[in-house]
Amino acid sequence: MSILPGFALVVLLLAASSAAADGFVLKKDVVLGSPAAAGVAGPMFVMANQIESTAPNVIVATGNVEARQAGQNFFADWLRYDTTLNFVDARGQVRLEQPTLWVSGDTLKFNLNDYSGELTQPTYQLIPQQGRGIAPPLQQGSGNALPMQQGRGNAERIDFIDANNSTLADATYTTCPVGNDDWFLQVGELDLDKTRQIGTAHNATVRFLGVPILYTPWLDFPLNNNRKSGVLAPTFGTTQRSGADIVVPYYLNLAPNYDATLYPRLLSKRGLLLGGEFRYLLSEAGGVNRLDYLANDRQLDRSRWEAVLNNTYRLSPTTQVGMLYNRVSDDDYFRDFSNQAAITSISNLNQEIWIRSQHSNWNAELRAQIFQTLQDSTSPTPITPPYARLPQAHLGMTQTFGPGIEFKLEADATYFSNPSMVEGARVLAYPTLRLPLTNSFGFITPQIGWSSTYYALDSSAPERRISRNLPIFSLDSGVTFDRPFSLGGTDYEQTLEPRAYYVYAPYRDQSAIPVFDTAQLDFGYAQMWTENQFIGGDRINDANQLTLAVTSRFTEAATGLERLQITLGQRYYFDSQQVTLPGVAPRTSNTTDVLVAFSGQITHDWLIGGSGQFDTQNGSTISQKLGASYRPGPGRVLNLSYNFITQNTNQIDLSAQWPLAQRWYGMFRYNYSYFDNKLVEGLAGLEYNGGCWLLRGAVQRLATKDAQSTDSFFFQLELNGMGSIGSNPLHVLKQSVPGYLPSNEIFPTPNENLPTP
């Protein structure tokens, strides 16, 4: 054996025995940086049990061959290297390691000039440059993608086209760990583009537990976390109103800062609904715009549609313009096409354009706003449409001067339009002065303001010109006492925080003033500390009242964790009420109900909370809400709540997520109204975590606002790195079961042992 002169490489010729004796080893390229440019690969370093030259500029290495050159490592039982052609021929337990691809097989032929070659019977593993897997483009951060893992597979042959492209024939692809082929993609040809980080499969079949479940003649997918254009996983579902529901979205990655999604939706009872969404984010603008259109609803023999336009544009660092447009074709659109309670109960859709300017001590807004009111066809009482604001101008200002005196101004001018009611303009201004005085143990804040309002009404009003002017005075004060104590070996701090809030506003007759945008607030803890019991500008209460409350907090001294907070409060009236809304009787009592509220994390696993409103004069309960949540660990949550309001609500709400067996989780919700004698929402679901795949199913019954209910079924199979198939129940589960976590977020590593109950 010899080292040939004139080699453009360095050969380390070491017998196995001498290598062991002298301690020499070949330091392989662990980092595997980017390959050198074609034709300038640089020297090759070789180590083997035996190395010999068999021809000019040709060496043959035998036994435990290790070689390194230009950011890639070779391993084989036998390797031949031609320095003239810069060509490698390797056989027997061949392994090639590149920055984004590790591959092993039987025989390798590889040209180091252009990185072309061929490997037979390969087994490969992809090493993504960003992250460790694939996330659906529009679902990042939503919990819809399974844990990201490296892709792997095998093939009959792999052809290396160049440094960044290769093709595998008769290949498989999966993200399951080695030894687990629960699911894999079987393809006739698989192209890997490492520059674009995209894999393209031809004649692809998805096999799950040995059963083919999906075939496509063409499929591409990202090899990292980057977004890319392509068909997203289809979703399947069913509802009573629309029947089978199939959606096949197509995602368009138009640019890093804007994209679009097209989603044809086939509804077996109604027809084909075409939908599209466009999103963009620029330095000076941004928005989300969506349109759904069903040309002919077979149930109603007419078109159905929904439009949502939400856009903003920044004119300057302090000024923005924007528009929001929500509209549907008919009153029943959401009941027919949605299975979310928050959507099916929508009554008014907002449509507005605006311009806003925000500065350090003042802000201004000009807008025009109208609503689409959705009537309930099954209800005998029609919904009164809210007033349109055509237009509304608002000005806010704050300024501090002198010895901490705070000046604040809220001014508003609006024309209210509603053809079925009194219309007109309202101008109001409310300047205030307040002086906050605080120290380490308490505070006192006096405030005085002057409210001025002017109305110019149309000819249908009894009085066309109305003015209202009145002063408003308030005094807010509170102190804090604290003491340390120990319980069960743990140091705590308890506070006692009494607070008093006095308000005075003289009576002004407001019976001739129409109600444009005003409602009476329900009495609660937050409303105890407000000057006005009405929200909106059309009523200002006459007030001569004092609110007293006390709060006590129990806090761990070492951690600052608040274990328990309890509040007790009541308001006292010194004059009878005179200002009311039309049809509402004035109060007859000189005190309000007593309010009680509590919350806290009483142990590591238990959270509690509740509130109550009690009529002390009649000894009755007006309302109460009690809740508890037991959360001993991720994926283990039990929620219980009870909600009662006199002559209105009497509901119990139970929900849970819990491991049933190893890899199995169960979820449910039972929300029942005893007042209406009906199920508000019922949900039952199961979830199985297979490590590199996840199967979940759920069934939901949801009461709609028309006193009926709708049933929905969800069934979804998630394949790690390939997306999901079926109807996605995650939004429903997270909304219905507070604290719910998908099991792949609880145990993000597929090899990790999953718990038993």
What positions do the PLM features span?
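Cleaved targeting-peptide boundary
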Residues: 21-29
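N-terminal signal peptide c-region/cleavage motif recognized by signal peptidases
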Residues: 15-17
